[in-house]
């Protein structure tokens, strides 16, 4: 279990409600149970713009690095699991 800093939690609050609905539960519920590599990938993901993140999460654009692609897919899976859509 890792400690998620207040800074990372604050940076997870974005300017778009759609992103907040994906990222805030992830940072509070799922990320603390991950390893340092996942935390680093998530922190890197937060450097992207809101528009990039929305496009990556809704699948209209591919993330620009493999690391970002993997963390986006992981966040989407965690979100689907929380929503009861594990097989999606």
Task: Report residues per predicted region.
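Positively charged, polar, low-complexity stretches
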Residues: 1-88
């Amino acid at each position: 279990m890792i400690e998620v800093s207040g800074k990372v939690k604050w940076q997870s609050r974005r300017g778009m409600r759609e992103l907040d609905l994906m990222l805030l539960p992830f940072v509070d519920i799922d990320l603390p149970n991950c390893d340092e590599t996942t935390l680093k990938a998530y922190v890197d993901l937060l450097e992207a713009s809101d528009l990039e993140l929305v496009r990556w999460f809704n699948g209209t654009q591919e993330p620009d690095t493999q690391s970002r692609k993997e963390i986006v897919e992981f966040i989407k899976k965690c979100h689907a699991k929380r929503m009861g859509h594990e097989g999606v």
